[in-house]
């Protein structure tokens, strides 16, 4: 029997939502083992004073299996 755990992270990129997702998964992989899935819970853009997009933020729920 395996047991899974879900952790929520917020990640960002100045390039795109896709880049923010990839950065978040890569960073999670550094500290968590047995990553199984990711759910994109939320997406948000941060705007500068000029109205231009400065940052893409993504909230992810990462599922990983806990080792015995």
List the predicted regions and their residue ranges.
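Amphipathic, hydrophobic secondary-structure cores in small proteins
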Residues: 36-39, 45
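A cross-kingdom feature marking charged/low-complexity
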Residues: 44-68
């Amino acid at each position: 029997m395996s047991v899974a755990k879900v952790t929520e992270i917020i990640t960002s990129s100045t390039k795109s939502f896709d880049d923010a997702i990839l950065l978040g998964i890569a960073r999670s992989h550094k500290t968590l083992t047995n990553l199984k899935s990711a759910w994109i819970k939320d997406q948000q853009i941060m705007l500068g004073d000029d109205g231009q997009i400065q940052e893409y933020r993504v909230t992810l729920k990462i599922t990983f299996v806990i080792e015995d």
